[in-house]
Amino acid sequence: MALLSITPLVSRSCLSSSHEIKALRRTIPTLGICRPGKSVAHSINMCLTSVASTDSVQRRVGNYHSNLWDDDFIQSLISTPYGAPDYRERADRLIGEVKDIMFNFKSLEDGGNDLLQRLLLVDDVERLGIDRHFKKEIKTALDYVNSYWNEKGIGCGRESVVTDLNSTALGLRTLRLHGYTVSSDVLNVFKDKNGQFSSTANIQIEGEIRGVLNLFRASLVAFPGEKVMDEAETFSTKYLREALQKIPASSILSLEIRDVLEYGWHTNLPRLEARNYMDVFGQHTKNKNAAEKLLELAKLEFNIFHSLQERELKHVSRWWKDSGSPEMTFCRHRHVEYYALASCIAFEPQHSGFRLGFTKMSHLITVLDDMYDVFGTVDELELFTATIKRWDPSAMECLPEYMKGVYMMVYHTVNEMARVAEKAQGRDTLNYARQAWEACFDSYMQEAKWIATGYLPTFEEYLENGKVSSAHRPCALQPILTLDIPFPDHILKEVDFPSKLNDLICIILRLRGDTRCYKADRARGEEASSISCYMKDNPGLTEEDALNHINFMIRDAIRELNWELLKPDNSVPITSKKHAFDISRVWHHGYRYRDGYSFANVETKSLVMRTVIEPVPL
C-alpha cells in the first residue's frame, strides 16, 4: 500500500495544495448556464426545501439530514496518549509473549485436542483484529490441521476416532478462507438417517451450541451449487434463534450468537467485529493467563490505531471543509461515516492512503449522485458531463456556480489520488481512473434522462447501466492502487473492470441498494429500480414477488463472489482481491436493514463512536 506519513499529521501527499484549496472554496450565490446569445443569472436559495430563480427552476429535494459531525467537533477531539512509544513497546513485548505461550505448538501436542485448539487460536486472533502479527504462525497451524483433514472432516485432535461438528465446521470455514481446498461434503457426516441436520434434545448444552454456531459461520462461505451449505445455514439459523430463547440473555454465549446472526460475514466489518469480540473474549478459555495477554494486546493495538485515526479524521474533516462541501447543501455529507467504514476494513497503520482515498472517493460519489439524481436539471447535467470528461478546468466557465465547486472537488481529488497511486505502483494510473469516472458520469446521465422523461427501462437495460452507476468501481479503484500490493495490468484486470469479481460486487451493490431505497427513490420521482423494472418485464407479479426474486439474485451473486475470492489454484492471490471484496462488505453493512447512507441511524452513529471516536477501556 502507498505509505502516507501521518507523523505528526497526515502527509501533504493526500492534501490539496494551497492554491487548489482556495480554488475549491466557493460560495453558491448564483446558478447560471452560459448559452450562445443568452446570459442567464439565477439567484437560488440553498435551503433544501425550495429554490427560487428568475425562471422558476423547480428542483427535486432529497430531504437528507445534515452532517452529524461538525468540523469544530472533530477538530476539538482531545488526542489520546496511545501514540506514545511506550504503548508500542508494550504491544511488541506482548506479541512476543503470545508467540511463546500460545503459538508454542509443543504445548498443543495433546492428540485428543490439538486440532481444535489450533483452530480456536487462529479464530481468536483473527476476530480480535491482530492476526497480521502472526501470519507465519497461522500458516503453520493451518498446515498442520489440513494435514489431518479427510473426507469426513476432523475430530478435536489427530488421534480422535470420531469426527466433531465444532472442529469440522470451524476448520471448513478457516481453511477455506485461507485458500485451502476443502469440500463442504464433510458436513454430510453430521446429518441423520433422514438426511437432515439434527441436534440433541437439550439445546442448552454449550458445547453443542458452539458447534452449531460455527456451522452457521461456515455456511456463509458457501460456493455456488453447495446444497449442503444451504441446508446448514437454514438449520443453524433456526437452531440458534431457538437457543437464544432458552439461554440467559445476558450471557456471553448469547451476546456472541446475537453478533454472529446480526452481522454474518458479508455484512461484518473486521474492526467492528474486533471491538465487539473484546467484550466476550476469554470467558470460555481455560488458559486465563494466555487469554488475558491476548486481550491486552488486542486492546493496545485498537487504541494505538485509534491515535492515528484521530489525526486522519481531522484531516478528512479539514479536506471536506476546504473543498467547499459545506456550501453544497443539496447533497448528503457522510464523510465521517465513510472514514469509519474505511477504518473498519483497513486498520493496518500503513494503509492510510487507502482509508483516506476511500473516504474521499465515497464523498465525491455521494455529491455526484445527489446532483444527478435530485438537484440538477437535464440541461445542466449534460453540460457538466461533457465538460468534466474534458478534464480541463478552463472549460468549466459555462457551468452553474454550484457545479463549478463540484467539478473542482472531483478534478483535484482524483488527480491527487493518482499521484499517490503513482508512488505506490510506479506508474501513472490517471487515465485508467478517468475511464472509470467517465463511465460513471455517463451512467448517471442515463439515469437522469430516465427520471426526467419518466422512462422505465427493461430489467436487463436497467441492470447493465446500474452496475456502472453503483459507482463501486471509482470508489474502489484509486484507493486500491495506493496499496503496497503490486497491481500490474494482468492482476488489475482480475480485480477491476472487466473482471467477474468487479461485476458481481457491482450487481450486489445495485440490487441490495434498490431493495433498501426504492420506496424513498420513488417518492422523489425516481421510478426506475430493479424491482419496478422486473415487475414491468413480468406483468402480474406483485412487489413482494419482485423483491423475493431480487433477494434470490443477491444470494446467488454472493455465492459466486465467494468463489471468485476464494477459488483454489487461482493465479491472482487472495490478498490482491481482498480489499475490493471488503469494500463490498462495507456496502452490505450500510444496507443491512435500511439505507444507512442517506439516513445515519443509531447503528451508524454507534459504529463511528465505537470504532473511531472512543478508545477501548484497558
UniProtKB/Swiss-Prot annotation:
GO terms for cellular component: chloroplast. Keywords: Chloroplast, Lyase, Magnesium, Manganese, Metal-binding, Plastid, Transit peptide. Mg(2+) 1 binds at D369, D373. SUPFAM superfamilies: Terpenoid cyclases/Protein prenyltransferases (SSF48239), Terpenoid synthases (SSF48576). Mg(2+) 3 binds at D521. InterPro entries: Isoprenoid_synthase_dom_sf, Terpene_cyclase-like_1_C, Terpene_cyclase_plant_C1, Terpene_synth_N, Terpene_synth_N_sf, Terpene_synthase-like, Terpene_synthase_metal-bd, Terpenoid_cyclase/PrenylTrfase. Coiled coil: none annotated. Pfam families: Terpene_synth, Terpene_synth_C. Its EC number is 4.2.3.117. It comes from the Eukaryota. Its main location: plastid. GO terms for molecular function: camphene synthase activity; magnesium ion binding; terpene synthase activity. Its cofactor is Mg(2+); Mn(2+); K(+). Pathway: Terpene metabolism; oleoresin biosynthesis. A motif (DDXXD motif) lies at residues 369-373. The conserved 59-Arg-Arg-60 motif may play a role in the isomerization step of the terpenoid cyclization reaction sequence. The Asp-Asp-Xaa-Xaa-Asp/Glu (DDXXD/E) motif is important for the catalytic activity, presumably through binding to Mg(2+). This is Camphene synthase, chloroplastic. It comes from Abies grandis (Grand fir).
